[in-house]
Amino acid sequence: MRRLWGAARKPSGAGWEKEWAEAPQEAPGAWSGRLGPGRSGRKGRAVPGWASWPAHLALAARPARHLGGAGQGPRPLDSGTAPFHSRASGERQRRLEPQLQHESRCRSSTPADAWRAEAALPVRAMGAPWGSPTAAAGGRRRWRRGRGLPWTVCVLAAAGLTCTALITYACWGQLPPLPWASPTPSRPVGVLLWWEPFAGRHSAPRPPPDCRLRFNISGCRLLTDRASYGEAQAVLFHHRDLVKGPPDWPPPWGVQAHTAEEVDLRVLDYEEAAAAAEALATSSPRPPGQRWVWMNFESPSHSPGLRSLASNLFNWTLSYRADSDVFVPYGYLYPRSHPGDPPSGLAPPLSRKQGLVAWVVSHWDERQARVRYYHQLSQHVTVDVFGRGGPGQPVPEIGLLHTVARYKFYLAFENSQHLDYITEKLWRNALLAGAVPVVLGPDRANYERFVPRGAFIHVDDFPSASSLASYLLFLDRNPAVYRRYFHWRRSYAVHITSFWDEPWCRVCQAVQRAGDRPKSIRNLASWFER
């Protein structure tokens, strides 16, 4: 599956990397499988050992006798790559570890047996043809000075480079453009925001943002005055405001409300909304070339009224889905070489982390999968809950980010599980705050399209909540292994999407790039709910 974060590049400069390099490498295999004395909630309770962990986590934590060795302890765990089992391959792993942390998802990992077989082969002399008797016997065969490599080797090398380039293009060529990717042409475009997202229909409009200053997108004319409807090349409709309250479409089809009773928000009756949308789709003479953009940042489980929207009513979609016409995720990683990046030494020191697991939840619902999993996990490890409802306590005055920064792990549990639905719970509450996210949402492969595999822990990697708890406690006792979950900070920084101005500017950018190509959405509900 294609990933949406760029290639890693190690920046210069010192920071927490020096602290990590000087830290002692503790041996995970020395853990006995039972909790020793420690903080409250972590002692006196038996938990499963490495046998119940996923293969790529358990192999590195086994004692040496389980790997066929003798007298040597296991190597520290690498959450980003599978461990190697031979001494020669272990040296290779230590030399290539930074590159392997961000290896492409387009290539499968090499089985451990292959590494053992490779380590057992005799060393081939440099320049000797593959399969020659000299190479098989481990001898050396010298070429005459000045001749260089045979032409067959050069041809094979060129063919290999060509194949690599083609595979790279196939894996990366069709990715949706990242928001910081390329400069934008300066074609003048007017974009009208029909309602401000999450602010309600009748809130006072804020001044439009400067897209050139915020996102280096020029030629944008952002509009809030509905009298400018005929001048706009695109009109944004926020789904939540679209399906609540009386119909409020562009004139002359919209119903204008004037009294307090009329502006009271309510979910439209299905037949009423469907009839209004169908009439609008079939009889609306829009200005030439104008696009209606459906905008939504909620999951299908929390998007009522989808099926009441008529076919061909909208031209584009704007959402967190990567296959939207305008892709605006809740956040993303970008290379630190980008101008204005914060300094690289941002990994929080372990001395400030006084708690183990934190969770901030605003809507408590016992029917949700995240609440059910919390009840299972809290039986084996202490979880401090903040927010409204359930066992939550108020967020301290220092704020959410500073509170989460005091914990080693954060439960980035989504309220529903859908494709690409990865919200601020991962980007802001965990990655930006400096805690290792434990995620519950779409599958691991979906997460790895947006973040490196070694930057998070997925609940699906473990057969049970008790097995996950044992792994979290293992990381708590092995700080050198825990720090590996912050390797991505060497090369990337976190961008948090602003839902006031960023969708506005991204639509302007998309119109500039698309030109006058016509399009309409035939069945919005079937696309979004799949």
Swiss-Prot record:
Any one GO CC term of the record: cell surface
Biased composition (Basic and acidic residues): 88-106
Pathway terms, separated by semicolons: Protein modification; protein glycosylation
InterPro entries the record matches: Glyco_tran_10_C (IPR055270), Glyco_tran_10_N (IPR031481), Glyco_trans_10 (IPR001503), GT10-like_C_sf (IPR038577)
Residues carrying covalently attached carbohydrate according to the record: 216, 315
Transmembrane segments: 148-172
Bilayer topology: Single-pass type II membrane protein
Nuclease keyword on record: no
Keyword Transmembrane helix assigned: yes
Catalytic activity reported: a beta-D-galactosyl-(1->4)-N-acetyl-beta-D-glucosaminyl derivative + GDP-beta-L-fucose = a beta-D-galactosyl-(1->4)-[alpha-L-fucosyl-(1->3)]-N-acetyl-beta-D-glucosaminyl derivative + GDP + H(+); an N-acetyl-alpha-neuraminyl-(2->3)-beta-D-galactosyl-(1->4)-N-acetyl-beta-D-glucosaminyl derivative + GDP-beta-L-fucose = an alpha-Neu5Ac-(2->3)-beta-D-Gal-(1->4)-[alpha-L-Fuc-(1->3)]-beta-D-GlcNAc derivative + GDP + H(+); an alpha-Neu5Ac-(2->3)-beta-D-Gal-(1->4)-beta-D-GlcNAc-(1->3)-beta-D-Gal-(1->4)-beta-D-GlcNAc derivative + GDP-beta-L-fucose = an alpha-Neu5Ac-(2->3)-beta-D-Gal-(1->4)-beta-D-GlcNAc-(1->3)-beta-D-Gal-(1->4)-[alpha-L-Fuc-(1->3)]-beta-D-GlcNAc derivative + GDP + H(+); an alpha-Neu5Ac-(2->3)-beta-D-Gal-(1->4)-beta-D-GlcNAc6S derivative + GDP-beta-L-fucose = an alpha-Neu5Ac-(2->3)-beta-D-Gal-(1->4)-[alpha-L-Fuc-(1->3)]-beta-D-GlcNAc6S derivative + GDP + H(+)
Enzyme Commission number(s): 2.4.1.152
Keywords from the named record: Glycoprotein, Glycosyltransferase, Golgi apparatus, Inflammatory response, Membrane, Signal-anchor, Transferase, Transmembrane, Transmembrane helix
PANTHER family to which the protein is assigned, alphabetical: ALPHA- 1,3 -FUCOSYLTRANSFERASE, ALPHA-(1,3)-FUCOSYLTRANSFERASE 4
Function summary: Catalyzes alpha(1->3) linkage of fucosyl moiety transferred from GDP-beta-L-fucose to N-acetyl glucosamine (GlcNAc) within type 2 lactosamine (LacNAc, Gal-beta(1->4)GlcNAc) glycan attached to N- or O-linked glycoproteins. Robustly fucosylates nonsialylated distal LacNAc unit of the polylactosamine chain to form Lewis X antigen (CD15), a glycan determinant known to mediate important cellular functions in development and immunity.
Protein name: Alpha-(1,3)-fucosyltransferase 4
